[in-house]
From Swiss-Prot:
Membrane topology reported for the UniProt record: Single-pass membrane protein
Gene Ontology cellular component terms for the protein in this record: membrane
Species of origin: Arabidopsis thaliana
NCBIfam families cross-referenced by the UniProt entry: A_thal_Cys_rich
TM helices/strands, residue ranges: 59-78
Name recorded for this polypeptide: Protein PLANT CADMIUM RESISTANCE 9
Protein's job: May be involved in cadmium resistance.
Subcellular location(s) of the protein: Membrane
Highest taxon in the source lineage: Eukaryota
Length: 148
C-alpha cells in the first residue's frame, strides 16, 4: 500500500459521514481549494460518480452553471447530495441538503468528494477509470467458427 493510499483510508461506518462539513481545511486542502475555484467542475465529477457514468461530468457541470445563472444551482446540486445520502444511508446533517448547498456550496462539494473517496470512488478519476473502464469501447469477443 502506498503512502497516499494510507492517507486516504478512513474508517467507514454505514449511516455516518466519514468527515464533517467543515473539515475541508483540515483534511484535503487541494480539493477544498479546487471546489472554491471551480465548483462546477467539482460538481460534475461528483455527479458523474453518483450517476454511475450515465451523466458525463461535463454535462453535469454545464447543468449546474445553467441552473446557477437563474439562481437554482444550489437546488440542482442539493439533489445529488440527497442521492449520495440515500446511497450510503447518511443523515441529513447538519441541516437540509438545500440549505447546505445554498449557503456553503464549496464546503458541501468538498465533503461529498471526500465521502466518495473514502468509500473507494475517486471523483477526480472519473467513472470509467475508477471502474476499470467498464464502458470503454472494447470490441466484443466473437467465438471462432467450428472447424472440421
Amino acid at each position: 500500500m502506498s503512502e497516499q493510499e494510507g492517507k486516504n483510508e478512513k474508517k467507514v461506518t454505514e449511516g455516518q459521514w466519514t468527515t464533517g462539513l467543515y473539515d475541508c481545511l483540515s483534511e484535503d486542502i487541494s480539493t477544498c481549494c479546487f471546489t472554491w475555484v471551480c465548483p462546477c467542475v467539482a460538481f460534475g465529477r461528483i455527479a458523474e460518480i453518483l450517476d454511475k457514468g450515465e451523466t458525463s461530468r461535463g454535462l453535469a457541470g454545464l447543468m449546474v452553471v445553467a441552473m446557477s445563472s437563474i439562481g437554482c444551482g444550489w437546488y440542482y446540486a442539493s439533489k445529488y447530495r440527497a442521492k449520495l445520502r440515500h446511497q450510503y444511508a447518511l443523515p441529513e446533517a447538519p441541516c437540509a441538503d438545500g440549505a447546505i448547498h445554498c449557503f456553503c456550496c464549496p464546503c458541501a462539494l468538498t465533503q461529498e468528494h471526500r465521502e466518495l473517496k473514502h468509500r473507494g470512488l475517486d471523483p477526480s478519476l472519473g467513472w470509467n477509470i475508477e471502474n476499470g473502464g467498464l464502458n470503454s469501447n472494447t470490441p466484443p469477443f466473437v467465438a471462432s467458427g467450428m472447424d472440421r
